[in-house]
Amino acid sequence: MRAPLSTHDRCLVPDTYDIRLTITGNDGDKYPAKQHARRAAMKLGVSAGLVYLVGQPTINWGDSDQPRPFRQRRYFYYLSGVDEADCYLTYDIHSDLLTLYVPDFDLRHAIWMGPTLTIDEARHRYDVDRVCYFSSLQGHLESWIDKHNNSSPIYILHDTQKPHVPSRENVYLDGEHLLPAMDAARMVKDDYEIRMIRKANQISALAHRKVLENIHRMTNETEIEGLFLATCVSHGAKNQSYEIIAGSGKNAATLHYVKNNEPLHGRQLVCLDAGAEWDCYASDVTRTIPLGPDWASEYVRNIYCLVEKMQETCISQIRRGVTMKSLQDSAHFIAIQGLKDLGVLHDYDVLEIFHSGASAVFFPHGLGHHVGLEVHDVSVQPNAASAAAEGPRQTFFVPMATQSSPGLEPGMVVTIEPGVYFSELAIANARKQPLAKYINFDVAEKYIPIGGVRIEDDILVTHSGYENLTTAPKGEEMLEIIRRAIDN
């Protein structure tokens, strides 16, 4: 049966009849944009208003005709599932109407770059109620403003993303409440999002394993980065969640070392922090790898075993209601006792050392963070500030940690990434601090050639405890892979 399109549908296919027969996946295959929009509205705590989001525009490099690599704005993606440039989105909270605006057809662009997304394609691909061309956006906004007569606001993320309605004055805009509401919504992942993070971790694990199988042949950090990238791309993950960190020797003590261009000869280990992205969702994985069939010295083995203990203990403590602050404190207590046993720290009381901040010379960052659409995903900021204020601190490090909710909830994905580092800069600076009395600098300096050790996994909080989403080999399994590759 053919029926005229309603006014609502004319945005989909203007002035025609919808007489197609299509067989598509069910809505469960689509990114759950409508569910996310409703969740964000619930966090806003209002029953009316218009959410207005601007997608990432096409932008060229400065003084160039070449475009910057496209990366969709994450808040836009969360409410749309659209990974296309130059799109817009509105969500009418009262009428529960989610509308996507796609670029109008441009013949020149289509000839050079291929056609942009059509209304029909977008409607069937995305979980939205209505799809329109961008040329209709201003008129729709004007109609909405006139209808509501400033009784309800247009919610925006930033003042730089205001809607363009020059014909209307004194538009009621709210740029304060949408961002924290969407942050609160994004913290707990739904089943679809967890599948994406799991897939990103699976590809990351393949790439980490490939590096382990070939590390004995490599002579430069560049080769590690290249092989990891190639493996991810060959499995469909063209983007990385962040710049690859492949720091060997002393470079492993630089937390975000990304030059990845130095020779491996004469060095004992490499810290490989690298995670693939899948459909805009991140993974965050770190493995510390020996440059040989075993750890090069007892110094290296001892530090690896200490970090391994820190991670295993903290992961085992994850459950609903536990705070990242308590987990980070636990990691510091283990690090302090371990460094005391190795003679790096003098034999003072563990709590005294903790409160002095001396352990942060060797473990200067947070234990973990949320993972999702960003590798350092959104969280509730007040808790982050309070946790940073309460933890071990000193004057020359600002902890990353505790970008987390007050208590972990099922559906959250967080990293557990303890590390112990021997940074020449940090150790030299520590000599000038009151905390210097807790550190045995003669012993600490013997560990400087190691650089540092970090182990990182992505952990899903569940109703019964946790699930480790990261399957990249570590520990004895990692060593066995390296040995088998050498033997073959």
Curated annotation (Swiss-Prot):
Disulphides: none
GO molecular function list: manganese ion binding; metalloaminopeptidase activity
Biological processes per GO annotation: proteolysis
Pfam family, any one: Peptidase_M24
Cofactor note: Binds 2 manganese ions per subunit.
Stretches assigned to coiled coil: none
Cofactor(s) listed: Mn(2+)
Enzyme Commission code: 3.4.11.9
Binding residues annotated for Mn(2+) 2, in chain numbering: D273, D284, E456
Transmembrane segments: none
Catalytic activities: Release of any N-terminal amino acid, including proline, that is linked to proline, even from a dipeptide or tripeptide
Alphabetical list of InterPro entries matching this protein: Aminopep_P_N, Creatin/AminoP/Spt16_N, Creatinase/aminopeptidase-like, Pept_M24, Peptidase_M24B_aminopep-P_CS, X-Pro_dipept-like
Swiss-Prot/TrEMBL keywords: Aminopeptidase, Hydrolase, Manganese, Metal-binding, Metalloprotease, Protease
Binding site for Mn(2+) 1: D284, E417, E456
Role played: Catalyzes the removal of a penultimate prolyl residue from the N-termini of peptides.
Family: Belongs to the peptidase M24B family.
The protein, known as: Probable Xaa-Pro aminopeptidase ATEG_00858
Species of provenance: Aspergillus terreus (strain NIH 2624 / FGSC A1156)
